[in-house]
Amino acid sequence: MRNLGFHLPAKQAIPAQRSLSGILRVSHQYDVVVIGVGAAGSATFFELARRGARVLAIEQFYPGHDRGSSHGESRIIRLAYFEHPSYVPLLSEARRRWVDLDKTSKEKVFLTTGSVEIGFPGAEMIRHSLDASRRHKLEIHEMDAAEIRRRFPAFQVPDDWTGHFQPDGGLLIPEAAVRRYVDAGARLGGKLITGTKVKNIRSRANAVELEIEGERITTNGVVVTAGAWLKELVADIRLPLTITRQVVGWFEPLRRPSNFDAGALPVFLLAAPDDAYYGFPNYRGSGLKAASHIPGRPLSGANALRQDATVEDEKGIRHLLRRYMPDGNGPLLKMQTCMYTNTPDGHFLIDRAEHDSRIVIASACSGHGFKFAPILGEILADMAEQKRPAFRVEGFSANASQRLPPVPDLV
């Protein structure tokens, strides 16, 4: 049987391999099936294959597609984590693994740029990220507005603002990372079906049964990393989830373009009184990328997402550029939409299905999950194999009473 997913162009769909699924229906039993091959799913697929498990991954589109939450050319990794200090050890280990993955990848996966966080007086983001950094003894450099403007002249912020720089931050290339994990997992013996949607997951006495287009696959365990499609597959999740439409834009700098290049501009978060933004330097001619991190317009479901960015969406991002990065407020290069799958408290959801512990659920990363993919892959592989995870995940439970305190408000 042929492995799929080797060196896939970012926008090339792969047809489902019907001969493979036909064989599965007749004779194949898997140790684990992974549903959804985005950030967490691709890393889990790789990790299980590395361990020698009989693993199958099923992706309804293709690895690196633009219809979910694992695309957009770049993702931030930052260690000074305002969301909660408990993420920092996970991030430190994830970063080490991203560096290792980059060394073995034909495509660039990770670039160190440092990360800078900037905010208005009293911004919760600044206070909590500093607290997390100090607790975990991260290298961090605090700055007043004058130093921010001098060191990173792309920013023109008010005199009473403050910020800090953390040198270990950087940008990840999501499509390349997903392809790398899929490629490596397939080379280790993992199987992949693309262009095929899982219709049902059924619990049986001796196995879990999946239906795909009228055919059935049996497995000892399932990992559902389906992002915004999670509740379509596992309906008894008690934690309410909200899917939101998010828009990102790429811009050609108006003046002094070298100030916006990777090496001059780090990846950044900026907390303004009326919004919170994130962005990336110009890397390989992509332009300055920026977006709001505040959850956007709710969607009725995952299939409601369209690549339909509007002039109004552009205006929202230009508000950042006009006020705080005026030299970057040049011609629009392109815009793109994606989805956040949000929990009420802004933290992840990692747990077992209430009705069947053989079904592991991991999704709802609330817009900040991609950077954790290498660690999520190990955690989910452990859970799928009925092992105790190497990293603690109790704070990400579907039980609201066990979860971490809510992520601090950004505005």
Language model region names:
Residues 41-42:
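N-terminal Rossmann-fold NAD(P) dinucleotide-binding loop
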Residues 167-220:
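Helical element adjacent to the flavin cofactor pocket in flavoenzyme catalytic cores
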Residues 319-411:
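C-terminal catalytic lobe of FAD-dependent flavoproteins
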